[in-house]
Amino acid sequence: MIMDTNAVSFRARDEVTTQLAPGTGGQAVPTSNGMMTRFAMSESSLTDLLHKAATQYPNRAAYKFIDYDVNPDGFTETLTWWQIYRRAKIVAEELRGYGASGDRVAVLAPQGLEYIIAFLGVLEAGLIAVPLPVPQFGIHDERISAALQDSTPSVILTTSPVIDEVTKYAPHARAGQGGTPIVVAVDLLDLDSARELDLTPPAHSSTAYLQYTSGSTRSPAGVVLSHKNVITNCVQLMSDYLGETEKVPSTAVSWLPFYHDMGLMLGIILPMINQDTAVLLNPMAFLQRPARWMQLMGKFRGQISCAPNFGFELAVRRTSDEDMAGLDLGHVRGIGSGAERVNPATLQRFIDRFAPFNLRDTAIRPSYGLAEATVFVATAEPGRPPRSVNFDYQSLSVGRVERCANEADDGAKLVSYGSSWTSEVRIVDPEARTECPAGTVGEIWVQGDNVAMGYWRNPQLTERTFDAKLTDPSPGTSIGPWLRTGDLGVMFEGELFITGRIKDLLIVDGSNHYPDDIESTIQEITGGRVVAIAVPDADGEKLVTIVEFASWGHSGQEAIDKLRSVKREITSAISRAHRVRVADVVLVATGSIPVTTSGKVRRSSCAERYRNDGFTRLDRSA
């Protein structure tokens, strides 16, 4: 093998470490822990940021990937900023032989350093990246096919272990466009080549990448994100999280998949903004042993992380004191909870579980965002613990919010996302397109430089979503254009609360019901994944709940009695808390409810499967 004389790697004690890049004279590069780091707003592109990190901090660790397949205790592979930069340049040279300006390049690779090299290589080539998940062996993924058909990439980047599976998708990627995309295994390129590289900053289009939405209610759509969108949103995120743009966390820890907007931002892009380190692991490694997340936060002194609500729940349930022995979380500054409904009870359990290891409650940050706004829109002000309010269900059902008479009452407990953000946010009547008064539920509209340019080659959907105009806006509020998020929210006591999705709203017996609230009630009983759907019947729509129920070791009549007991408890709890009748409670095995690649329940698929009697019911005889 030809070794790169600019950055030579060697293995030692289950970790890949890196020698100094030439020209640094063996000088010690100071770590960034506790240092003042300025956000680089003068840089106009992600490639500018990568170049700056590589030249200013060549020997600083950029990305550490902890591989638990190689070693159950974790095998650490590290790339410095100089290494990642040179390897991305080598990938870029390869890509220039296959693609022209404006072409798309899809990345379908396992979670790992090769994925990062591939993604950054696309940007260094001046092309448009399309981050996607790697296909599962032997299973055709229609959503990957749909994203490839929509983006029509000229090249697909992958790795040698999965190239055969990925190649099966290539013929569908340019159906009707002519030509099949080239499939390139990044790990088979001579990434350690000693040859001289052209380090001239690349010419690039304004578009950095296409972020395909998870598509819980429709086919995935490619959100067109510019370099400006992404850099702006990084700065917004750090400013809203920390209340400053000078001191930034040094180490990010993430198990989120790179193809997901939050995983891409936290795991790959934010470290370039901070010019610091990301500690990364495979999502499956987290799911197998959730304790690994908090262990890495303690071991590597991670200061920022993020996860959906279920990640917090798993960490609470499956992390022991022994797992955390000798570890301290007092340095953690922000762990965001987003990408799905935030359950206040889950956050409190998380805070209580890790408080003995010095985790501050102010570090837990409920966060709202969506791919159409790059990823992040709002969080509460820094320095305060999560706040929640218990809202009366009956008021919510008619589009207003009122506190429950007392905290012990059954109600919708919602978290606050604060009152001051770097994005413009308004609550709007989606029909009249006028701003809603405080206390009235409406659609969340967003405005700012983080809002994407639109959907890839979908002008009709782009106009409906990104070009909304307000009628008679209040003083200081622009007419538009505004991003229509499709999310429902309300301003209460000056703060933002999110109630659900417009498309998910259930109308049963003439009243509005938020499925998230009903699902939260059931989860307090069963602890597993739940979906609440409305299914048409002769009198309108009926409420049906699909409930995943873990095996409990019972059999025969004892099992039947247990299932009946659970169904009665669920029916009673929903009737008492939400004043709505459940037409059917369907108990199914864990893993039965269809979800998107980011773990969100696919409600439309659930409804269709229920109508076709497609669920294998545990309660068939109960």
UniProtKB/Swiss-Prot annotation:
GO terms for cellular component: plasma membrane. GO terms for biological process: Actinobacterium-type cell wall biogenesis; fatty acid biosynthetic process; lipid biosynthetic process. Pfam families: AMP-binding, AMP-dom_DIP2-like. SUPFAM superfamilies: Acetyl-CoA synthetase-like (SSF56801). Its EC number is 6.2.1.51. GO terms for molecular function: adenylyltransferase activity; ATP binding; ligase activity. Disruption phenotype: Deletion of the gene leads to selective loss of phenolic glycolipids (PGL). It is an enzyme of class 6 (ligase). It catalyses: 17-(4-hydroxyphenyl)heptadecanoate + holo-[(phenol)carboxyphthiodiolenone synthase] + ATP = 17-(4-hydroxyphenyl)heptadecanoyl-[(phenol)carboxyphthiodiolenone synthase] + AMP + diphosphate; 19-(4-hydroxyphenyl)nonadecanoate + holo-[(phenol)carboxyphthiodiolenone synthase] + ATP = 19-(4-hydroxyphenyl)nonadecanoyl-[(phenol)carboxyphthiodiolenone synthase] + AMP + diphosphate. Signal peptide: none annotated. The keyword Mitochondrion does not apply. Keywords: ATP-binding, Fatty acid metabolism, Ligase, Lipid metabolism, Nucleotide-binding. InterPro entries: AMP-bd_C (IPR025110), AMP-bd_C_sf (IPR045851), AMP-dep_synth/lig_dom (IPR000873), ANL_N_sf (IPR042099), FAAL/FAAC (IPR040097). Pathway: Lipid metabolism; fatty acid biosynthesis. It comes from the Bacteria. The keyword Acetylation does not apply. Belongs to the ATP-dependent AMP-binding enzyme family. Catalyzes the activation of long-chain fatty acids as acyl-adenylates (acyl-AMP), which are then transferred to the multifunctional polyketide synthase PpsA for further chain extension. Involved in the biosynthesis of phenolphthiocerol, which is an important intermediate in the biosynthesis of phenolic glycolipid (PGL), also called mycosid B. This is 4-hydroxyphenylalkanoate adenylyltransferase. It comes from Mycobacterium marinum (strain ATCC BAA-535 / M). The gene is fadD29.
